[in-house]
């Protein structure tokens, strides 16, 4: 039986592209959402318009994706509570994972379902929400994704180290309660400023999550592939985890009042494939602005890539919210050969006497 882990040992895994991009291409109306009060609640469309979500998953699988993400980016009680739907969180996660699983099973070769867990709308570090409340909210989502059959949990578009730690804990607790272990992936979002939204650099992210025992640490969203290079290099050189990269289709531009992502598939794919080869990426795909055409362009090149081989050197460090500092003494201590002391070692004294 092929599992995600065995597939990752054999090849570079190809994930899907933007879910939101495909949903908004269908121009959802108030009727699609279920009324003006629910406008913008994309997670609810799994229930309201399941055929849309099915078609999107199918289109990415047909394009060559090995796995798709569930339509659950904001499907936790805190986010859904903004629409008065907190009590629907568990059911929506089960439904989304089950729907993706059903589509995956309709294809011949093994395809996988990745449970998408977004950052939410409240930052723990800035005091928008309490630890216990955020943990409880994520736990509901993790329970639903696992019960729906997700093959892995992806905590994505992370902007806050505190949020990452809470989400990882919620996933661990859910897995322990269900006695079911699935891979746990984390993807940070590094802005054009070079840091996460709250100011953390990628080295601080790595130092903070390294003890958590996750399986993948990567990047997604905010920028195109070119802008991710420096951060991917940091991970490539130091991270003990597999690396994922799901960039946007370039930096968005405003064209006649519309947001446009400038990297078309023929330009996007070579950039991502170059990064995969250069930095030893294990998982690639797309985020905002990417479509099945982008994934199809990637698929042709991914098949030619060898499984990544890296020799990372993780330096023990401590991190603040913003930066990581290596636990290194400079200047280093002077090593003294104390046992080469005739007064302290009879054996050494005898060797000296024997002129040995």
Question: Could you tell me what each predicted segment is?
Answer:
Residues 1-356:
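Domain-level signal for soluble alpha/beta catalytic cores
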């Amino acid at each position: 039986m092929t599992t995600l882990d065995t597939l990752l040992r054999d090849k570079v895994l190809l994930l899907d592209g933007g879910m939101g991009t495909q949903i908004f291409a269908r121009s959802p109306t108030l009727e699609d959402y279920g009324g003006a009060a629910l406008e913008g609640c994309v997670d609810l469309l799994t229930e309201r318009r399941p055929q849309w979500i099915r078609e999107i998953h199918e289109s990415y699988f047909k394009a060559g994706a090995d796995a798709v993400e569930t339509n659950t980016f904001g499907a936790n009680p805190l986010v859904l509570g903004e629409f008065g739907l907190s009590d629907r969180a568990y059911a929506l996660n089960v439904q989304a994972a089950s729907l993706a699983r059903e589509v995956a099973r309709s294809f011949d070769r093994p395809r996988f379902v990745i449970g998408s867990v977004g950052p939410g709308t409240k930052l723990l570090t800035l005091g928008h929400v309490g630890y216990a409340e955020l943990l409880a909210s994520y736990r509901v989502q993790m329970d639903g994704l696992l019960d729906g059959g997700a093959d892995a949990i992806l905590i994505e578009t992370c902007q806050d180290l505190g949020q990452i730690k809470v989400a990882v804990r919620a996933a661990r607790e859910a897995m322990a309660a269900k006695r079911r272990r699935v891979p746990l992936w984390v993807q940070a979002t590094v802005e054009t400023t070079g840091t996460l939204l709250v100011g953390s650099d990628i080295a601080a992210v790595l130092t903070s999550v390294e003890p958590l025992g996750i399986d993948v640490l990567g990047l997604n969203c905010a920028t195109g592939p070119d802008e991710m290079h420096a951060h991917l290099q940091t991970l490539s050189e130091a991270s003990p985890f597999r690396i994922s990269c799901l960039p946007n289709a370039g930096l968005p531009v405003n064209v006649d009042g519309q947001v446009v992502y400038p990297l078309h598939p023929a330009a996007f794919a070579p950039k991502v494939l170059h990064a995969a080869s250069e930095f030893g990426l294990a998982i690639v795909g797309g985020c905002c602005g990417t479509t099945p055409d982008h994934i199809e362009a990637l698929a042709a090149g991914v098949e030619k890539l060898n499984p990544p081989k890296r020799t990372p050197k993780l330096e023990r460090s401590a991190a603040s919210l913003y930066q990581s500092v290596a636990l290194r003494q400079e200047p280093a201590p002077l090593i003294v050969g104390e046992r080469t002391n005739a007064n302290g070692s009879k054996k050494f004294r005898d060797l000296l006497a024997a002129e040995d």
